[in-house]
Amino acid sequence: RVLFRSGDQPADQPAERMQDISPEQNPLFHPDKRRCCPMPGCFAGPFCPCCPP
């Protein structure tokens, strides 16, 4: 779970909402690369797995 310092996250956007993001909504998502993200983008979060080398 990603922790936010107080003030980084609006009160109406709790951190739990981040877990609802699908890979398609990840800005680093590449639909033309077999539903994966090239490095280093795939290290930005658990929503977009690294593409195989």
Curated annotation (Swiss-Prot):
Disulfide bonds: 36-50, 37-48, 42-51
UniProt subcellular location: Secreted
GO annotations of cellular component type: extracellular region
Main location: secreted
Domain of life: Eukaryota
Single GO term (MF): toxin activity
Tissue specificity statement from the Swiss-Prot or TrEMBL entry: Expressed by the venom duct.
The keyword Amino-acid biosynthesis is assigned to this record: no
Prodomain residues: 1-34
Keywords assigned: Cleavage on pair of basic residues, Disulfide bond, Secreted, Toxin
Note: The mature sequence of Reg3.4 described in Franco et al., 2017 corresponds to the mature sequence of conotoxin reg3l (AC P0DQO8).
Domain notes: The cysteine framework is III (CC-C-C-CC).
Stated family: Belongs to the conotoxin M superfamily.
UniProt protein name: Reg12l
